[in-house]
Amino acid sequence: MIREERLLKVLKAPHISEKSTMVAEKQNTIVFKVAVDATKAEVKAAVAKLFEVEVETVRTLNMKGKTKRAGARVGRRSDWKKAYVTLKAGQDIDFMGAAE
């Protein structure tokens, strides 16, 4: 059993991009930025508990941080992990809330 404290630290934010929007509309898949050390089981449990939905599959990938320049200085952004969470048919996550 995964502790609730850990589940709250697994998901960082939804990842909003053109690709993630298309995937959400066509395949009922939500993209999240997750902790680098998070496992697929932890991501699945966190999404199911926090959003009260049924998760079908979870696919994860490590994203390499980009190299950035500021004049002569060269820096690097941190590496991060992305998770594609496919929900079962009929399930949906409403990030906007119930604004009436």
Curated annotation (Swiss-Prot):
One of its GO terms (biological process) is translation. SUPFAM superfamilies: Ribosomal proteins S24e, L23 and L15e (SSF54189). GO terms for molecular function: rRNA binding; structural constituent of ribosome. Keywords: Ribonucleoprotein, Ribosomal protein, RNA-binding, rRNA-binding. GO terms for cellular component: ribonucleoprotein complex; ribosome. Belongs to the universal ribosomal protein uL23 family. NCBIfam families: PRK05738.1-1, PRK05738.1-3, PRK05738.2-4, PRK05738.3-2. One of the early assembly proteins it binds 23S rRNA. One of the proteins that surrounds the polypeptide exit tunnel on the outside of the ribosome. Forms the main docking site for trigger factor binding to the ribosome. Part of the 50S ribosomal subunit. Contacts protein L29, and trigger factor when it is bound to the ribosome. This is Large ribosomal subunit protein uL23. It comes from Aeromonas hydrophila subsp. hydrophila (strain ATCC 7966 / DSM 30187 / BCRC 13018 / CCUG 14551 / JCM 1027 / KCTC 2358 / NCIMB 9240 / NCTC 8049). The gene is rplW.
